[in-house]
Amino acid sequence: MTDPTYVLVHGGWGGAWVWRDLGEELTRREVPWTAVDLPSAIHGAHPNTFLADDAREVAVVANAEGPVVLVGHSYGGAVLCEAAQDVTHLQRLVFIAALVPLLGESATESVREVQARTVLDEAIQVDGDFLTLEPTLAKKALYQDCGDETADWALTQLTPQTIASLRSPRSSFDVDAPSYYVRCTLDNAVDLSVQELMAARCTEYATLESGHSPMFSMPEALCDLILAAT
């Protein structure tokens, strides 16, 4: 049986670069992987870039492979939910501190049931049709346990996120594939109470004592969990 390729999907304001350290760990273990750049967060993104556009990009990348495991971080979880029904050889979904909206919910709406304000909320700034992040607060929200060198580098990579992508509702139905949720207990971006709600929508869950970005702060431990999930 062919080993699956791990298709890594970043969250808001990110890019394929967020998987730098986890990708190195997967490569070291001879695990095939690829990472997607979502169109809602690329430089020069069109303001009318929606969740469906991000999902379409994921499906294109995934369907160029054989069997795949989709791995989504933060907003990337919403993208996985939207893309999954169009991925031909999907084996499993893995969510990392991610949003798992129900049918008809947007990424933004999926967290409203839990009234929990985070450092990320304080960091967000509106710039026309985009959201940007104030750097000092973004570091605390996203990278507080990643080490200064990594965190400061990551801050230079962040890009504006289209508001449309976060506000557009999920339109695809659930798929018949197991799902695995990784909760991050020290997260300053997606409150743990939100993660617990999202994890309850998945088949299984595990926990890391990490901030929002374990792909940087503890890539080996995260890799262990992702591979154990399959």
Task: Give residue ranges: language-model regions.
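Conserved HGGG/HGGXW glycine-rich cap/lid loop of the alpha/beta-hydrolase fold
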Residues: 3-43, 89
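Active-site signature of alpha/beta-hydrolase-fold catalytic machinery across serine-
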Residues: 21, 82-83
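Active-site loop/oxyanion-hole signature of alpha/beta-hydrolase fold enzymes
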Residues: 35-69, 85, 108-112
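Gly/Ala-rich beta-loop-alpha elbow adjacent to hydrolase catalytic centers
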Residues: 71-76, 80
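Flexible "cap/lid" loop of the alpha/beta hydrolase fold
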Residues: 85-90, 94-132, 162-166, 190-191, ...
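Conserved alpha/beta-hydrolase catalytic His-Asp/Glu region
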Residues: 127-173
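Conserved serine/cysteine hydrolase catalytic core
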Residues: 159-224
